[in-house]
């Protein structure tokens, strides 16, 4: 065996070397270990369904290489949508709840939160989602401590702010903001006691070492992020990463299993790219430790598995 068996308690001092040893395990051994740890910390039959809505689409000032919403992407065909009204957002949230989602996530395409009418509307949305009996999550870019405090007071459950990749590879993906700025936002959110939703994207041209470095940073947070989205790049024509090849599904499985081992108490969310996976590949991801998915036909601006496909997946997991 190439790595020690992972047991409780939860650790926050994982080295890159230790995580790399886990990542490099033979796949069946890696999945077996991750599945065992998953069962120690979670009900294996518990699969959270979250729903994600773009409440403001396109026109973003940033240049994230994977994203279709940048205002710098003249070659991308995207219908811009200005800020949705709270009533329209809450109608979508209610429908998501009726479709089985218990968390509703709202994303706005901008660099950072700015105080004013738009942010006030977001606060109203958060309050409304909580009143529906759902968890509320937002992804709004960078923010400061006082804005995090207002979100907390509105009842926000979690704030999504992905680190995407390693600090070393990040400048090859984004140039309009820094990794340290991302970390500062996470610190502001943590300072108000809001749960972190923080993960990354694989398939952007990064190395295994970059993936390991990302996991080491996430696993170094105390507490660990409440949820860790593992996204597979969805190449969008016209973006700098639009010509990337489709990721091998087993790379997604390996990333999820390693994340489960080093963050045993977090929800690991099988996120973007899921629509390209077969039903069997998705189930293998769940065996390896994924216990949350996004439900709905679209994730912000990229395709997601259909509701009918997800219904068939749920039936396969737990026949009625």
From Swiss-Prot:
Family, similarity comment: Belongs to the radical SAM superfamily. Biotin synthase family.
GO annotation terms (biological process): biotin biosynthetic process
Keywords assigned by UniProt, alphabetized: 2Fe-2S, 4Fe-4S, Biotin biosynthesis, Iron, Iron-sulfur, Metal-binding, S-adenosyl-L-methionine, Transferase
One of the Pfam families matching this protein, by short name: Radical_SAM
Enzyme Commission number(s): 2.8.1.6
Stretches assigned to coiled coil: none
Keyword RNA-binding belongs to the record: no
A GO molecular-function descriptor: iron ion binding
Cofactor note text: Binds 1 [4Fe-4S] cluster. The cluster is coordinated with 3 cysteines and an exchangeable S-adenosyl-L-methionine.
Cofactors (names): [4Fe-4S] cluster; [2Fe-2S] cluster
InterPro entries: Aldolase_TIM, BATS_dom, Biotin_synth/BioAB, Biotin_synthase, Elp3/MiaA/NifB-like_rSAM, rSAM
Gene that specifies this protein: bioB
Domain Radical SAM core: start-end pairs: 45-274
Function, as annotated: Catalyzes the conversion of dethiobiotin (DTB) to biotin by the insertion of a sulfur atom into dethiobiotin via a radical-based mechanism.
Keyword NADP applies: no
Recorded catalytic activity of this chain's protein: (4R,5S)-dethiobiotin + (sulfur carrier)-SH + 2 reduced [2Fe-2S]-[ferredoxin] + 2 S-adenosyl-L-methionine = (sulfur carrier)-H + biotin + 2 5'-deoxyadenosine + 2 L-methionine + 2 oxidized [2Fe-2S]-[ferredoxin]
Transmembrane domains' residue ranges: none
Class in the EC hierarchy, top level: transferase
Pathway annotation from the record: Cofactor biosynthesis; biotin biosynthesis; biotin from 7,8-diaminononanoate: step 2/2
Binding site for [2Fe-2S] cluster: 105, 137, 197, 269
Name of the featured protein: Biotin synthase
PROSITE patterns according to UniProt: RADICAL_SAM (PS51918)
Signal peptide coordinates: none
Superkingdom: Bacteria
Subunit structure: Homodimer.
Residue sites binding [4Fe-4S] cluster per the record: 60, 64, 67
């Amino acid at each position: 065996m190439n790595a020690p068996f992972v047991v409780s308690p939860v650790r926050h001092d994982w080295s890159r070397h230790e995580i790399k040893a886990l990542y490099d395990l033979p796949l069946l051994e890696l999945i077996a270990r991750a599945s065992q740890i998953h069962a120690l910390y979670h009900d294996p039959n518990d699969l959270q369904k979250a729903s994600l809505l773009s409440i403001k689409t396109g026109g973003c000032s940033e240049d994230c290489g994977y994203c279709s919403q940048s205002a710098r992407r003249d070659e991308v065909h995207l219908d811009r949508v200005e800020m949705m009204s709270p009533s329209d957002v809450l109608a979508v949230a209610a429908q998501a709840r009726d479709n089985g989602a218990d968390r509703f996530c709202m994303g706005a395409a901008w660099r950072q939160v700015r105080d004013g009418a738009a942010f006030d509307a977001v606060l109203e949305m958060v309050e409304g989602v909580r009143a529906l009996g759902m968890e509320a999550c937002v992804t709004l870019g960078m923010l400061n401590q006082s804005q995090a405090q207002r979100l907390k007071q509105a009842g926000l459950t979690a704030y999504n702010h992905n680190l995407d990749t390693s600090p070393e590879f990040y400048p090859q993906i984004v140039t309009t903001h820094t990794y340290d700025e991302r970390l500062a936002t996470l610190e502001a959110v943590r300072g108000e006691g809001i749960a972190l939703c923080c993960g990354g994207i694989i398939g952007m041209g990064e190395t295994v070492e970059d993936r390991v470095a990302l996991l080491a940073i996430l696993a170094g947070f105390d507490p660990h992020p409440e949820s860790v989205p593992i996204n597979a790049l969805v190449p969008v024509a016209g973006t700098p990463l639009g010509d990337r090849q489709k990721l091998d599904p087993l790379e997604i499985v390996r990333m999820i299993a390693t994340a489960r081992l080093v963050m045993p108490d977090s929800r690991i969310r099988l996120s973007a790219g899921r629509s390209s996976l077969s039903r069997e590949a998705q189930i293998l991801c769940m065996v390896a430790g994924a216990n949350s998915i996004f439900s709905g036909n679209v994730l912000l601006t990229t395709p997601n598995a259909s509701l009918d496909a997800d219904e068939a997946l749920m039936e396969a997991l737990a026949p009625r």
